[in-house]
Amino acid sequence: MRTTRWMLIVLALFLVSGMALAQGGDTSALKPPKGYKVAIVVFEDLQCPDCARAEPLLKEAEKTYKIPLVRHDFPLPQHNWSFEAHILARYFDSKSKDMGEEWRHFVFTNQNSFTKDNLRGIAERFAAEHKTNVPFAIDPTGQFKNLVQADFQLGQRVGVQHTPTIYIVSNSQRSAPVVEVVDRTQMFQQIDQIIKQAGGTTESASAAPIKKPTRKPPIKKDAQ
């Protein structure tokens, strides 16, 4: 199975690159989207419990500061349904970016209800609620897998060793371009400081509006 092979490759890369990652990575590729001075960047795993705990804070920061939340796929090899959930996220992205964002938020909100066996069924119900469907083969050409792999490889170059890894990024020359959020209780203070250093504003006239995900009721776990 392709997914199993990919997970084995990921595990091997973790083992081989561990020493290099411990020495830090290249964060130069992490920048705010066009039109924004400041953004939040997160490398996350949809099956990671700590990522689910961080999700409300990230969404609150996005709403409070009106800055983009840029998500990167970083499915860990020890999680048995995460990779497929990220593939589904990319599939929903292909329908609309808002739908992909809603799927990720939905997964984190209902993470404890997911299993490897019921993932597809939940995704099909989510799709139906959004007036679309999940085809039998959602990634026949491998394009979504390639996007997930590209994000994972970016995370390795950056030096990601755990999920979530959160950065505040800025294009201001008066502040550090990338600041890692080590203590999430300090994240808002870090954002305040970086926005102040960026001149007190977070976006330019060309910035795209940030949309909030549609809230969905909690799901019930499929009967085993």
Residue ranges: model-predicted function:
Residues L8-G18:
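Bacterial N-terminal signal peptides
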Residues G25-A29, E55-L57, D151-L154:
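A generic local structural motif
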Residues M1-I9:
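Bacterial N-terminal signal peptides that target proteins for export
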Residues P32-G35, E62-T64, W81, R157-H162:
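Extracellular/periplasmic catalytic domains that process cell-envelope and extracellular macromolecules
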Residues V41, L46, A52-A128:
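Structural alpha/beta surface segment adjacent to cysteine/selenocysteine redox centers
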Residues E124-Q224:
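C-terminal cap of thioredoxin/glutaredoxin-like
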